[in-house]
A protein has these predicted regions:
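Ser/Thr-centered flexible coil motifs
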Residues: 7-11, 212, 256
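Amphipathic alpha-helical segments
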Residues: 207-232
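Conserved AMP-binding
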Residues: 240-266
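Short, Lys/Glu-rich amphipathic helical modules
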Residues: 230-240
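Hydrophobic face of alpha-helices
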Residues: 176, 220-223, 242, 246
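Short, flexible/disordered secondary-structure transition segments
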Residues: 186, 190, 233-234, 259-260
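Domain-scale recognition of functional cores that engage charged ligands
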Residues: 1-2, 7
Length: 266
């Protein structure tokens, strides 16, 4: 019993149950988004977040923009528009984040409470630092900056080339299905203990089971079904499909029937 990853006592939380697996950060670069207020050194007091955000698209250059309060599991509830491509944004932002980050496919996760994730289909959203974004390493090939270099140095056990190669083997929709599963919530609890916050390091260290193309395709098809349903009707109940994903996830992690009952609260 000491190896059961779902045990929630502090003693048993530090388990090595899935030590042989790659972790999420081996597949994805994980980062906060931009901070849309003026940099204290470059433009002290010139503008605040509210000055850059509009409910509507207008003549000012803008991009679609989301915050954590706008997302939920498999959906984006609200979109606003952030000034972007002007003299002050992103040039004078306190944290602009590198521009290539906003032009590739990403998963988005919240930073407080229960983990929820969604998917940027068309690489079209800016997001602020209330959201943790994740992009496959392969999609950042050729992008060089201090943020990426520092992240690899601090958090990675693999080389960038190795992670880029590894990320060729997964689909973001597969990872989304894993991360939105009940078991991922348990794994997150194991990592953060009683903390209400979710940090990039928590996301990076969630173990991810290796899956064949066929195994991934099952989860991808279910995720696509949910995403398509939510696009048509954001309020649609997709709990049955999510339960199907949970069942696939349990198999990939090799959970026993008894462990599944614990995760399911039965």
């Amino acid at each position: 019993e000491k190896n059961f990853v779902w045990n929630l006592t502090q003693e048993k939380r530090n388990t090595n149950r899935h030590d042989g697996m790659y972790v999420f950060g081996d597949y994805c670069y994980v980062s906060y988004g931009l901070r849309p207020n003026s940099d204290e050194k470059k433009a002290k007091g010139e503008f605040k977040k509210e000055d850059l955000i509009s409910e509507f698209q207008d003549d000012i250059p803008r991009r679609k923009y989301i915050e954590a309060k706008d997302i939920y599991r498999y959906k984006i509830n609200k979109i606003r528009f952030l000034e972007y491509g002007t003299d002050r944004s992103p040039a004078k932002l306190v944290r602009p984040t590198f521009k290539e980050w906003f032009d590739i496919s990403k998963l988005y996760f919240n930073r407080l409470g229960i983990l929820v994730g969604t998917f940027d289909y068309d690489n079209k959203y800016l997001h602020n630092d209330s959201i943790i974004g994740a992009a496959l390493w392969k999609d950042l090939n050729g992008v060089e900056n201090k943020s990426i270099t520092s992240s690899i140095k601090k958090f990675s056990t693999m080389s960038r080339f190795e992670m880029e190669q590894l990320s060729e083997s997964v689909d973001l929709r597969f990872l989304l299905g894993i991360m939105n599963s009940k078991y991922a919530s348990v794994l997150l609890t194991n990592l953060r203990g009683g903390d209400y916050h979710i940090y990039p390091e928590h996301i990076r260290n969630i173990p991810i089971p290796t899956a064949t193309v066929e195994q991934q395709s099952v989860i991808i098809a279910l995720v696509e079904k949910i995403l398509n349903t939510k696009r048509i009707n954001p309020a649609a109940d997709t709990s049955m499909i999510e339960s199907e994903i949970d069942a696939e996830v349990y198999r990939l992690y090799g959970l026993s029937d008894d462990e599944i009952k614990i995760v399911e609260g039965r």
